[in-house]
Each structure stands twice: as C-alpha cells, then as structure tokens.
Amino acid sequence: XXKEIXHIFHDN
C-alpha cells in the first residue's frame, strides 16, 4: 500500500 506514485500501483 501506498499512493506515493500517484495511482499507478493502486495497492491501497
């Protein structure tokens, strides 16, 4: 989880 990179890896 992380939104550090916009929402490319939308692994909330």
Swiss-Prot record:
Mind telling me which GO cellular component terms the entry cites?
extracellular region
Where does it reside? Answer: Secreted
| Residues spanning the membrane | none
Keyword annotations for this protein, in alphabetical order, are: Antibiotic, Antimicrobial, Bacteriocin, Secreted
Output one GO BP term.
defense response to bacterium
Q: What does this protein do?
A: Has antibacterial activity against Gram-positive and Gram-negative bacteria including Salmonella, B.cereus, B.megaterium, L.casei, L.viridescens, M.flavus, C.glutamicum, C.crenatum, L.mesenteroides, E.faecalis, S.flexneri, S.aureus and B.thuringiensis.
Q: How does it assemble?
A: Monomer.
Q: What is this protein called?
A: Subpeptin JM4-B
